[in-house]
Amino acid sequence: MKLVWLGHSAFRVELDGAVILIDPFLSGNPKFNGSVAEASAGATHIVLTHGHDDHIGDAPDIAKATGAQIVANFEVCMFLNGKGAENINPGNTGGSIDCGAFVVSLTQALHSSGTTENGQSIYLGNPNGVVITPKQGPTLYHMGDTEIFSDMALIAEIYNPQIGIVPIGDRFTMGAKTAALAVRRYFKFDAVVPCHYGTFGLLDQSPDAFIAALGGSGVKVDAPAIGGHMIY
């Protein structure tokens, strides 16, 4: 599995011939200086955790350009279908979606989900974390935007993820110390990748506090620069 951080909560996952984009907020991200076309080249699937603009991001345009299938909760899929995304594969919390080379499972997250158009709020279902279980290789858990919650223990028991993607930026998600507590208390990750930090001034700007809080835990923390990648 090759995992590329594209900034904020956006990732590119390459496994067994599939190219998965998670929450591809790219052109609107002031810290992303790459090419959307290059970042999304060969995309087969777009997996979305929830309906906020900084997570849906470029998903509709990428889906139209590449034909990638959008996998998300029902409301997000229907909303994007109305925006011209034809290849959708909806699910909901607790469900799993077989995508061939991998399975996507939608887990609970403590957050909100929606957007605003013409001054009106649009409800876009419950927020999710996503577990990507490949036919071969490590299981990946992207927590989405969330606070810590005790049922993370059930996610660990059910899916046994080896790689964790963890929001740490505070303000709109849990902060570094709470995120580290979640990792320590509920999971047995081989490696974790922090996200949802440094994008805007309201967020924590560095993963340093998260890394320090996991000191001595035995969990490897991979915190690449935007565009950097890991092989698992």
Swiss-Prot record:
Which PANTHER family does the record associate with it?
Answer: UPF0173 METAL-DEPENDENT HYDROLASE MJ1163 (PTHR43546:SF3), UPF0173 METAL-DEPENDENT HYDROLASE MJ1163-RELATED (PTHR43546)
Q: Does the keyword rRNA processing apply?
A: no
The name this protein goes by in its record? UPF0173 metal-dependent hydrolase Msil_0741
Concerning SUPFAM superfamilies, the annotation shows:
Metallo-hydrolase/oxidoreductase
> Is Hydrolase set as a keyword in this record?
yes
- Any one GO molecular function term: hydrolase activity
Q: What Gene3D superfamilies has UniProt attached to this entry?
A: Ribonuclease Z/Hydroxyacylglutathione hydrolase-like
Taxonomic placement = Bacteria, Pseudomonadati, Pseudomonadota, Alphaproteobacteria, Hyphomicrobiales
Spell out the Pfam families in the cross-references.
Lactamase_B_3 (PF13483)
Q: Which InterPro entries match?
A: Metallo-B-lactamas, RibonucZ/Hydroxyglut_hydro, UPF0173, UPF0173_UPF0282_UlaG_hydrolase
Similarity field? Belongs to the UPF0173 family.
NCBIfam families the UniProt entry points to? PRK00685.1
Task: Cite the entry's keywords alphabetically.
Answer: Hydrolase
